[in-house]
UniProtKB/Swiss-Prot annotation:
Residues 68-97 are annotated as: Disordered. GO terms for cellular component: plasma membrane. It is a peripheral membrane protein. Belongs to the UPF0161 family. This is Putative membrane protein insertion efficiency factor. It comes from Marinobacter nauticus (strain ATCC 700491 / DSM 11845 / VT8). Residues 72-97 have a biased composition (Polar residues). InterPro entries: Membr_insert_effic_factor_YidD. It is found in: Cell inner membrane. Coiled coil: none annotated.
Length: 97
């Protein structure tokens, strides 16, 4: 079922998209988002996420980084969240000479 859903998306990516002048305002592109959503979440939820993404993609959309929920890149720690305060190399106490 997944491969059947991915077939028209792959056709679009390799046969149609390269001939189009416009580019997706999101990263990953809407077609790549659909592939990742279907592969990660399955046909039903992935198809729903892909459809919701396509509805968010329009000329007035802000665009930018919009990963598939639950993917590795989306769950990676943000800057500063992986630091343990006890592992700091800077001392907070001052020594007097």
């Amino acid at each position: 079922m997944r491969q059947l859903l991915l077939l028209p998306i792959r056709f679009y990516q390799y046969a149609i998209s390269p001939m189009m002048a416009s580019h997706c305002r999101h990263y990953p592109t809407c077609s790549q988002y659909a592939v990742e959503a279907i592969q990660h979440h399955g046909p039903l939820k992935g198809g729903y996420l892909a459809t919701a993404r396509l509805l968010r993609c329009h000329p007035w959309a802000e665009g930018g980084y919009d990963p598939v929920p639950g993917t590795e890149l989306n769950t990676a720690p943000r800057s500063g969240q992986a630091c343990n305060p006890t592992e700091s190399t800077h001392s907070t106490t001052q020594t007097r000479h």
